[in-house]
UniProtKB/Swiss-Prot annotation:
Organism placement in taxonomy: Eukaryota, Metazoa, Chordata, Craniata, Vertebrata
Ranges of residues in domain Thioredoxin: 1-125
Modification note: The enzyme can be inactivated by further oxidation of the cysteine sulfenic acid (C(P)-SOH) to sulphinic acid (C(P)-SO2H) instead of its condensation to a disulfide bond. It can be reactivated by forming a transient disulfide bond with sulfiredoxin SRXN1, which reduces the cysteine sulfinic acid in an ATP- and Mg-dependent manner. Acetylation increases resistance to transition to high molecular-mass complexes. Deacetylated by HDAC6 which decreases reducing activity.
Quaternary structure note: Homodimer; disulfide-linked, upon oxidation. 5 homodimers assemble to form a ring-like decamer. Interacts with TIPIN.
Name this polypeptide is given: Peroxiredoxin-2
Active site: C12 (cysteine sulfenic acid (-soh) intermediate)
Species this chain originates from: Sus scrofa (Pig)
Gene name of this polypeptide: PRDX2
Length: 127
């Protein structure tokens, strides 16, 4: 589960596309990848329908959730309340619903998909 600040921003598309492009690697590990922002479903759809060459996402292999109430962001502790957006949070939750890893980055700092895969593999290896 990863949170990102807003659709149509600078860092977000590179992260989301990277997670989408490697979704099969996560699936092979028994993982589902979900992206979350405070944007509405219509905004997600517009971003997905915008070609990558024009700053859009294009077709994705992962779902984007619309946290318009900001309850998910608040519950996971990533809501930047003064701006009403989420920090870049990554939560790795195992098949039993146990939270295994939390990483929260400041707004301008992106995440590496390789590191997320490594963390999933590490938690599975130690089980």
């Amino acid at each position: 589960l990863f949170f990102y600040p807003l659709d149509f921003t600078f860092v977000c598309p590179t992260e989301i596309i990277a997670f989408s492009d490697r979704a099969e690697e996560f699936h092979q590990l028994g993982c589902e990848v979900l992206g979350v922002s405070v944007d509405x479903q219509x905004t997600h759809l517009a971003w997905i329908n915008t070609p990558r060459k024009e700053g859009g996402l294009g077709p994705l292999k992962i779902p984007l959730l619309a946290d318009v109430t900001r309850n998910l962001s608040l519950d996971y502790g990533v809501l930047k309340e003064d701006e009403g957006i989420a920090y870049r949070g990554l939560f790795i939750i195992d098949g039993k619903g146990v939270l295994r890893q939390i990483t929260v980055n400041d707004l301008p700092v992106g995440r590496x998909v390789d590191e997320a895969l490594r963390l999933v593999q590490g938690x599975q290896y130690t089980d």
